[in-house]
Amino acid sequence: MPLAFCGTENHSAAYRVDQGVLNNGCFVDALNVVPHVFLLFITFPILFIGWGSQSSKVHIHHSTWLHFPGHNLRWILTFILLFVLVCEIAEGILSDGVTESRHLHLYMPAGMAFMAAITSVVYYHNIETSNFPKLLIALLIYWTLAFITKTIKFVKFYDHAIGFSQLRFCLTGLLVILYGMLLLVEVNVIRVRRYIFFKTPREVKPPEDLQDLGVRFLQPFVNLLSKGTYWWMNAFIKTAHKKPIDLRAIAKLPIAMRALTNYQRLCVAFDAQARKDTQSPQGARAIWRALCHAFGRRLILSSTFRILADLLGFAGPLCIFGIVDHLGKENHVFQPKTQFLGVYFVSSQEFLGNAYVLAVLLFLALLLQRTFLQASYYVAIETGINLRGAIQTKIYNKIMHMSTSNLSMGEMTAGQICNLVAIDTNQLMWFFFLCPNLWTMPVQIIVGVILLYYILGVSALIGAAVIILLAPVQYFVATKLSQAQRTTLEHSNERLKQTNEMLRGMKLLKLYAWESIFCSRVEVTRRKEMTSLRAFAVYTSISIFMNTAIPIAAVLITFVGHVSFFKESDLSPSVAFASLSLFHILVTPLFLLSSVVRSTVKALVSVQKLSEFLSSAEIREEQCAPREPAPQGQAGKYQAVPLKVVNRKRPAREEVRDLLGPLQRLAPSMDGDADNFCVQIIGGFFTWTPDGIPTLSNITIRIPRGQLTMIVGQVGCGKSSLLLATLGEMQKVSGAVFWNSNLPDSEGEDPSSPERETAAGSDIRSRGPVAYASQKPWLLNATVEENITFESPFNKQRYKMVIEACSLQPDIDILPHGDQTQIGERGINLSGGQRQRISVARALYQQTNVVFLDDPFSALDVHLSDHLMQAGILELLRDDKRTVVLVTHKLQYLPHADWIIAMKDGTIQREGTLKDFQRSECQLFEHWKTLMNRQDQELEKETVMERKASEPSQGLPRAMSSRDGLLLDEEEEEEEAAESEEDDNLSSVLHQRAKIPWRACTKYLSSAGILLLSLLVFSQLLKHMVLVAIDYWLAKWTDSALVLSPAARNCSLSQECDLDQSVYAMVFTLLCSLGIVLCLVTSVTVEWTGLKVAKRLHRSLLNRIILAPMRFFETTPLGSILNRFSSDCNTIDQHIPSTLECLSRSTLLCVSALTVISYVTPVFLVALLPLAVVCYFIQKYFRVASRDLQQLDDTTQLPLVSHFAETVEGLTTIRAFRYEARFQQKLLEYTDSNNIASLFLTAANRWLEVCMEYIGACVVLIAAATSISNSLHRELSAGLVGLGLTYALMVSNYLNWMVRNLADMEIQLGAVKRIHALLKTEAESYEGLLAPSLIPKNWPDQGKIQIQNLSVRYDSSLKPVLKHVNTLISPGQKIGICGRTGSGKSSFSLAFFRMVDMFEGRIIIDGIDIAKLPLHTLRSRLSIILQDPVLFSGTIRFNLDPEKKCSDSTLWEALEIAQLKLVVKALPGGLDAIITEGGENFSQGQRQLFCLARAFVRKTSIFIMDEATASIDMATENILQKVVMTAFADRTVVTIAHRVHTILSADLVMVLKRGAILEFDKPETLLSQKDSVFASFVRADK
């Protein structure tokens, strides 16, 4: 065919120049080529030489660090320019196709312009990244020339009467506007940067974020193209495939996205709302307004992107309609009408009537639609993440000011706060993600219905009505689904609570043979949970069924109705497949409706919770007395502490309405020697609850400065409450508290240090920091060293002194990593005594002037207590003139006290020195003296020295105790430490990256059973085959409608043709009905499969764990086991079934679509291969990165929630130390770490979806082009073209979901893998050699114990802890066992219950070798009380007698023996009174007494007490000892002594050392031997 730039026709007007060259169209087109050629020739050398790639003087880790003015506008204009140029090229090709010869000038200039536009943006990007703006002069010239030449062309078109009816005229006008705007952008860069025409160019600094090498999240800084396509993630995804992603890889957040920045933005919004709404500044409405004020703009941007994406989504059906309609016509060639300038220009209608043009437009619309959609998702999620971080920071700041009483027994619990942080903030985040749907869904529905009506007419309203009318049903199902989920969550929480209790008390359960009771208790709750899960599965399957069946039903009703009621209008392929695509679009927002409504309701509830939390009571500063000395004496040196609790919901009490006056009146009334006192309380009444009875009444005390003050009293008299009241943690009803303002806050610490500030910033308290060690040790999940130093500067000498004073060095030596060992959450890897000593060590290490110690000796034996008292409290603190307040039951230390405060029933019984008590409180003093039974100080020091001298080696290492008090001897320390390091090394987390866990997948599916699995596979395959058959039949049916006349259809009568149509409709109806039924079958099958697997795996796991040996629980972290029952079971219960359904559906839909396209156009297979290779590598790289980022998102959320939990639990300690600001800084770090992981995960998901959807768009383009080509050559019907295009769009929609679901399934199958790993745990051997019939029912009835050559170890790989022990215990004897830590005392007691490996020797009880007994029989016939009290949530009756074997009288008798009868009678419900989880509503001593009562209930002939009275005061302990001796006079009692004096009345005393019996005789005999070890113990305990 002839080819020339201006054409080859001799008569062509293109060569005429008689009216001037500018009136020659070909010349004007040639003139338009000049600017483009100029740019290409100028820029290519610069790009290749490397001007644009040179880096700036500021060296940073990536290049895109600077944006010139108008950066985004330039990119937007360039994209529009490229689109218009593509249209111009296409228009030129179509216009040129009319004539025989080819006119290159119609499309070649546009092609050159397209190349130049791409070159311009590449050139600009390189100039921008190199920060060399002077080179932009080339673009300035180019835009000027292009604008001028294109303007000339536009004017000449107008002169030759070429107007809006010709598309070329419209495109030229748009190009003039675009070139002009780009020229203005370039001029604006000159104006701002002044790189030419000005003497002094304006320097621009790089963004502050990018000067920090740690900022690697580049989304805010890259150019617009990279932002839209997430191109910058390519390098990150590629790197992630080579090495694991960790926090160092994702580094820091940009400043604008950090929690502190967003928190400040939120605070500004809250302040603005507070000024507007003074009545309820923390109300729900005010919170919503503040959130919208702070984050609303980004939400509007996301909504704009979403609306644009939804509107562009309708391009697919419209283009399908146009393409199929064009191919369905007989004549595909339009006839030319009029020529202008020697050529013919097509109109817009002719342009849009071309199938190839529509295919290209469909491709571009899909690209743009997917880009806008992903941009909307990203902006919404980013906004939600920023909002979440801001709210979490605000919650934390509120916690720092909350009343302790409100946390401990008020409206807000620690669990509720953690839920607020972990759940409610996420609810708000996801609401912001779904929020744009609230206003985009109506737009999508309205436009969809209008287009359906335009294409189908009235019959379209039938199908639309079906979809819309079923929306309330969907909402109803979604509501029921939400209710079922909520009920499931309640039962799940109850089950986890019971499981947690069961695991924490596993040692007690095994010792008491209660495993089956608590296992049944968990199974009962699990059955309730499974009932809820079945309801959840039913509604989920209905929801899935409706999602898949409604489009089929709508299409069926619409099309059958169309041919039935509108017989004059046939169902053409263009109408059918365009309508089919529109129905799929229309269904989407209605599916989302239920999710959006649920999310909105949840967000409203969450904001209400947040409002209640933010409005809760706070501790606020009272007005303080002036710091200057008052005119009268030195009274002004005392200031009020911040004790006032402000409740924003209630008016302040009248008694504390104005405390400034009373305080100023009270302050001068102090004695003149006020400077000698640290703190003084006058007439104080304190309570825990706002309206409760005062816990402390009429408190008037003075704590001397620089001296040791001891607070003593019986259990529950208010000693700990007094400390907390002094620290300002209780609600003060009346009275005043004064702190000496001249007290230095700490030694060597600048009082103006910013670290001393509280989290509130401006709310600085007058009291200085107080080193506080609570009765219940509070530890961080950090190293031992970090817990002791507590973020204070490390002082090696002082650190060693503190370690020595607390006797921690032996314990540190056996830890896997010494003092760098992570101690676990709540110090779970340590024993009670170790936790207590680390807590005390923290208080000793701090250089504060005031130290409060709340019962630090409770979990320590006599030697540790004496050493701590002497080396720690006396030498480190008192001798250093620091004020020490010590709460204790150890009355033998009273002579060391400078000041004593005696409490009774919440009041001060007496305060003074010990001599004061001797003079004025003779009876009380004599009582103390009896309890103390002390000898003079010189003898005590002498015996201590003798004891130290008698030790074979000083500092003998003690074995590390487990959380249940397990004691190992020193010989196994090395081995145990090595094993601990190998099995549970919390100090270093090994990042393992596995491939797709196919084995776990096989185990999951095989757990469902062969029948259910077969049904699942068969129904899924059959369903998708039927769905393809429906659409294929529709193509055949609509193709038949293209034959216009009955004759052409080979029908003699019109009735026959109607019959033909009815056959098509009938078959279509049958196929659709079968498809709907199969949708129901598959949805039910997949959910029931998930239920069966969940039920089977949980039952297997529970049975395996409950039967596991105690060694398993001692070497496996409790949190790890609990996670299997919580998160992993939840994943299997609720997530895997839905993910499995989505994965199978999306995969089979993609396979079906590709199969149909390949069938329609086999040549598509050629293009499919490279696309498949690209998809494979994308999914391969994405899965690895997604798995790492998902795990990182989860692992960074755990420390965040744990930090909140730690803060709530240790709030008193944090506020006492004045460490609010430090902990808030940690919170910001944890929040930012979690947010950066979430943002990278979001960006990775967007990267995947953009890649896969762009590939999907390529599939659509290739499928469209090949289908059109085949159809034009009469090789393909229009119906099959429509079928192929519809399925091509389906690939575009489901390709990314397939990869996403595959990645999700890979992560979720990890739960199955972990559970199966636990199922391999070996169970204890519960079976015995003796048949139950051979064991007497009342065995053991005498209590005779024979121990013959007994050797015991904890594991076959470890060395013995008891060696060749031989002894005889006669019936009814009372045996006392003592020895140093690690001597084997507890191992001796555990041997009776076969809790340890008795590899040699035997124990014979009443003539029966216990090794031959079934474990349950043995353990149920003995009784033991452990050192650590264990109580379970439930009634007192359940805790005493879970087997329900005893009468009420027996239970009351046991309570009376344990000194608890009066306490329980005072409770509402008596024996049915509720004990909270862990017995938190009782004191430590009372919990231990309940455990004693529980043992008394069993009434066995052998009774073992393992340091059972450690947490009880001496008076109560003495009473109990007498009661035990009386109540168990005829029983054998083995007592392991914590306080040696408690076994002085025993018949025999056994002293153990290194697992062997050192001494065994009557206590009188051993005491008479001055060199006996027992005698030295007694002297030290006095």
Curated annotation (Swiss-Prot):
Residues covered by the ABC transmembrane type-1 domain: 299-602, 1013-1307
Which residue numbers delimit the ABC transporter domain? 679-930, 1345-1579
Query: Sugar-bearing residues?
Result: N10, N1050
Q: Which UniProt keywords apply?
A: ATP-binding, Cell membrane, Disulfide bond, Glycoprotein, Magnesium, Membrane, Metal-binding, Nucleotide-binding, Receptor, Repeat, Transmembrane, Transmembrane helix, Transport
Q: Where does ADP bind?
A: T1381, G1382, G1384, K1385, S1386, S1387
**Which residues are involved in binding ATP?**
W688, G716, S720, S721, S1483
List the membrane topology term(s). Answer: Multi-pass membrane protein
SMART domains linked: AAA
Q: Which residues lie on this side of the membrane: Cytoplasmic?
A: 48-72, 124-136, 187-303, 373-438, 474-541, 593-1013, 1085-1143, 1176-1249, 1298-1582
Locate the residues binding Mg(2+): S720, Q775
Membrane-spanning parts: 31-47, 73-89, 107-123, 137-153, 170-186, 304-319, 357-372, 439-454, 461-473, 542-557, 577-592, 1014-1031, 1068-1084, 1144-1161, 1163-1175, 1250-1265, 1282-1297
Q: What does this protein do?
A: Regulator subunit of pancreatic ATP-sensitive potassium channel (KATP), playing a major role in the regulation of insulin release. In pancreatic cells, it forms KATP channels with KCNJ11; KCNJ11 forms the channel pore while ABCC8 is required for activation and regulation.
Q: Give the family this protein belongs to, as stated in its UniProt record.
A: Belongs to the ABC transporter superfamily. ABCC family. Conjugate transporter (TC 3.A.1.208) subfamily.
**Subunit and interaction comment:** Forms an heterooctamer with KCNJ11; four ABCC8/SUR1 molecules interact with one KCNJ11 homotetramer.
What protein name is recorded for this chain?
ATP-binding cassette sub-family C member 8
